[in-house]
Amino acid sequence: MILGGSAMLAGCATAPVAQMPIVLAAAPPPPPLQRIPQITPPPLDPGRLVRPELMSRAMAALDVHSHRITLRDRMYLVDFQKFSGDARMFEVDLIGGRVTAFRTCHGRGSDPEHSGFARTFSNTPESYMSSVGAYATAGAGWGAQQGPNVLLDGLEYSNNMARDRAIIVHGADYADPEFLAREGKLGRSYGCFSTAHTDLPMLRERMGEGRLLFAYA
């Protein structure tokens, strides 16, 4: 039997294929946000060695004189309200917060009766008084009279004659522990920040150049 073309086509046709539903897989949840822990710097002066007003004024001076204070890892403060026999020069670690205290002298003109307390301050040459305000350390020096020292540049009207007056940080016999034990107080300088000979090498290295020394009364 000969089939017609239409019959042949009908015989070759296949049954329609049922379409399976497409199931979309759920997208994986986004990874949890990783919180970067905030690093809280340690507190400055946890032992509260420095008078709060002195600390706050020194911190302000760092910003006011930022063009000259180029290093902010540590600073040096002098509290002229304290007795000369007490440790009243402070190295403040601005990164770690630690404070180290040293003794330093004031000028004989600031304490003419040698009471151990600085009473008056001046920027005038030949006054032999201490000067207050912000200084920039200017590096290690060497003088014919005082030997190794740290040079200072006065940054304010109250101390901008520091170079002319040769106001420096230097070692002195009258700042040594033996003098203190004998006299009950330190001796007086001509306005310099005199320190014990044993403290000077470390201070000379660490003060360097471009750090703040701030004296206040």
Segments and roles (model prediction):
Residues 1-19:
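N-terminal export signals
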Residues 19-189, 198-205, 211:
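Cell wall/extracellular polymer interaction/catalysis modules
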Residues 192:
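Short cysteine clusters
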Residues 195:
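Soluble or luminal CAZymes and related metallo-dependent hydrolases
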Residues 210-217:
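C-terminal functional extensions of proteins
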